[in-house]
Amino acid sequence: MSVRQTLPYCAAASRDIGKPMRPLCRYVVLLATVAAFSTLVHSQKPSKQRAQTHKSAPTTQSQTSSGSLTIKSEPGAIVWVDDVRRGVTDSSGTLTLTKVTGGRHVIRVRATGFKESSTPVLPGRSHLAARLVRTTDEAELKFQQAEEAREKAKDDDARQQAVDLYSQALKLRASFPVAHVGLARALMDLNKNENALSEIEAARKSRPSYPEASAVEGRIFREMAFADEATKSFQRAIREANGFQPEAHVGLARVYEDRGQYEAAAAEYQVAIKQLSDSEPVIYQLLGATYEKLEKYKEAVAAYEKYLQLAPNGSLAPAIRSIIDQVRREASSREIVP
């Protein structure tokens, strides 16, 4: 039974059996959450290190105001804001982002068969026409195929196909840092972590300051149970991005959770949520689970409910509805106990 198939079963069984079923629901939601977050930004193992003082680099992006931005481009084009993926244009080539923080941004747009474009956007702008030019660059086309293959991959055979496509792109263009990072992600998905680290190193040769590469490096180190190295890489990513690197903030949160530093983990999740402008509901599930560990049940329920508000039909929704009921019952029982 797949994770997706198990979620509805988990929700129903939890209502019938009650608290004994709850650990299974937690486990299933965790599996599904990890899978969901792996695709977050295209998206972490325990350490025995002592708790360390939590301090993240301040973000330079304004979080106090936001507006909408409508991008017009090719149908099915992927849109990034400041290197954070925010969505895909519809069949008419339109994507409206309802929450874009104030300040200057860089909008990156990519569509299969076209040359990628990057456009700076000044504060107050509400519309952007991103006109793409068709490309015959074989390296670029292979890279685009690799990205699509990795995102759609459901098993190791498909992931290996993505690896092969990235490798072909790099043979055609040796200096291709974004392809090295994509290949690192694909290798990490295959648990080839040493090879993945080599690709991060290769990416930095032509782009020494590369926030996404540092964030992916942090994830690889966490998979290898090197918590201190993971922390350094995530902090480097945040520093390189002047504070705006949600993947790294989530990665740090996972490391802090591993160490039992739940307050610090919750703070990092909250930063990531603000930077992603509610575009990734799965982080609310992670935040809710952290609040539960802190026995902050009201906050946990609020986080879970926010997930359901943003993704009422999401793959985690059935289990999360069940968990909300369980958390409320647990909170009520604790209030009754003298």
Residue ranges of predicted features:
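Short loop/turn and low-complexity linker motifs enriched in small/turn-promoting residues
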Residues: V41-V178, G182
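Alpha-helical linker/edge segments of TPR/alpha-solenoid repeat scaffolds
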Residues: D137-E138, D228, D258-E263, Y297, ...
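Start-of-helix register in tetratricopeptide repeats
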Residues: E140, V178, E212, P246-E247, ...
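Structural signature of tandem alpha-helical TPR/SEL1-like repeats
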Residues: D155-L165, D189-A202, E223-R236, R259-V271, ...
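Structural marker of alpha-solenoid helical repeat scaffolds
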Residues: L172, K205-S206, E240-A241, Q275-L276, ...
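Canonical tetratricopeptide repeat
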Residues: G182, V216, V250-G251, Q285-L286, ...
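Terminal, low-structured helical/coil segments at or just beyond the last alpha-helical repeat
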Residues: K293, V301-P338
